[in-house]
Amino acid sequence: MILVIAEKPSVAQTIAAVLGAKEKKDGFLTGSGYIVSWCVGHLVGLAEAAAYGEQYKKWSYDSLPILPQEWKYTVAADKEKQFKTLKELMHRTDVFEVVNACDAGREGELIFRFVYEMAGCKKPMRRLWISSMEDSAIKEGFSRLKNGEEYDALFASALCRAKADWLIGINATRLFSVLYNHTLNVGRVQTPTLKMLVDRDAAIATFKKEKYYHVRLTLSGAEAASERISDKAEADALKTTCEASKAVCTSLVKEKKTAAPPKLFDLTSLQREANRLFGYTAKQTLDLAQALYEKRLLTYPRTDSSYLTDDMGDTAAGIIKLLCGKFSFMAGKDFTPELGKVLNSKKVSDHHAIIPTMELAKSDLSALPEIERNILTLAGARLLMATAAPHTFEAVTAVFECAGQSFTARGKTILCEGWKEIDRRYRAALKNKPETDEVDSDTEKTLPPFTEGQTFENPAATVTEHDTTPPKPHNEASLLSAMERAGSEDTDPDAERKGLGTPATRAAVIEKLVKGGFVERKGKQLLPTKDGINLVCVLPDTLTSPQLTAEWENNLTQIAKGKADPAAFMEGIEDMARELVKTYPFLSDDKAQMFKPEREALGSCPRCGSPVYEGKKNYYCSNKECIFTMWKNDRFFEERKVTFTPKIAAALLKSGKVNVKKLYSPKTGKTYDGTIVLADTGGKYVNYRVELPKKK
């Protein structure tokens, strides 16, 4: 028997169907000489720091840095059953070979190898490496399985990445958490991502709005605008001069321009567009795409490619024909796809772009939940746009001179709507029309037929006032773009991963920052919290710059190619962890207080007016020179069996008295209702007295 191990149950089922393994068992499928099982993502991972000794169970500066000499692995607590199943299958006497069918990429290699090694498997290993889950691609992949040893360098690269993230993440998180007495999660990807939000927030906060003006001339019904003018008086003077002058057309340029169709979706671009059109978070979009994938209506979503493989032309053509019949917005549209634009096997690494599948033919779109239907339709519309004709237009720029200044008018004439017609139709069909973030260049009007040398006497002129605008806060769409581009100028063109994170992990990074209290959502906006801003301020540039990721990716790419030494890379990471701990042995008192939660004052001190706060045993004045203190265990309250709560303290500070029910009388042994009055005489101790309600 040949044991095939996929990354997820849904993928295993697809492979099993192709191989003829139809008999369902607990945790695997079998038949036709194959056993097909799955990993459920990361079954095995690097053990936590506490696994390396008692001294690491408690977070302390003295135990840092933590540098394991022999790495330990652990099975995820909620996945022990599936690991046991895989281990038993690997050790079955009738299994003579194991096929790694996990995702074709660095992380897929790591997921399989961790399980293979922890299970103690020594059987021959081969690798399935495919870019499509179409039946034909799976069959072809199994006909050309490669020896597992050919991917040893890729595994070494993946292992280095995992260990390096562990070393820097664990040591930096513990170091700064201990120093600041507050849990501060530090990570190679999430920390530079947080810095992007903090930098944008600072740019908005320091932005100073400035007014500027344009003088606009009306010429044969068209409008020509001056350059930006910062002084209102200067703009008014130019307007007056122009109205008494002559405008001359000094330049007329006509250019035929082309707007190429958008590329197919990879995960990040799908998340950006879904956020822009529907307001979905990156995680929501990933979850929806995954659900559609498991329903076999959408191809694998965790991809960084925007192309299809060369052998998918016929498949794509069939899907496009299906979409034209399924989508109401394509009704009456004669469409001939240009498939060559989207086929390029060289630009597909792990998985091809996200597109609908032929399963759509059997599916009723209206039966899907609306949010899933939105994602599926979006992916389908993008496939249609990507294979449509380019949008072509004639751009006209006319320059005029008047009163010694230049004025420009711009217009366009559409020659072929191309893909923008499909985009327009798709948007018109949306239930909720999205807000437009940018001014569409299609709104430029057609200019009248100007000629060079044409003159206009005493043109009508107006002055328009404008404000410079601050940068916009990041939303998920803009942050995903920034993460994708981050550090790319420092990254090797051949690096498998560029930017911060991967398409599959960026959503989780954003969610982790929100959950950790470093970022908050306000509508579509992502804003850093006070803790988030402080964290970026206290961390060294090494940890907040995307350059570290770029450097790592360059090295990891070389390791994957067998051109760099994994041991040397890890030695450098360990040195970095040592240096980090060595550089930050202690903090000043002021800095150590940065992450203390803001205290809420109970009221004002009756003696000096300073805020009064709750302590462990008392309520005290924050002015160190003032001795006003109300003790929680004051004998006055204990004798009357009253718990001196913050609510009572606040009332005493506000009005000097508080009504309390069921006061105990030591003399009578009974309870009564009364008013406790703050009878402060300014001495070392605060006094109180009880006033009884007046009898009517």
Locations of regions flagged by a protein language model:
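Conserved short loop/turn motifs at secondary-structure junctions
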Residues: 1, 101-104, 181-183, 254-263, ...
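Intrinsically disordered, low-complexity regulatory segments
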Residues: 1-162, 166, 427, 470
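Basic, low-complexity terminal or inter-domain segments flanking catalytic cores
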Residues: 2-3, 25, 79, 90, ...
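Amphipathic alpha-helical transducer elements in NTP-driven molecular machines
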Residues: 9-16, 33-36, 40, 76-87, ...
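Feature marking long nucleic-acid-engaging regions of large polymerase/nuclease enzymes
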Residues: 97-98, 114-127, 188, 199-203, ...
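C-terminal or mid-to-C-terminal helical accessory/interaction module adjacent to the motor/catalytic core
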Residues: 135-217, 254-258
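Metal- or metallocofactor-binding catalytic centers and their adjacent structured scaffolds
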Residues: 233-265, 271, 547
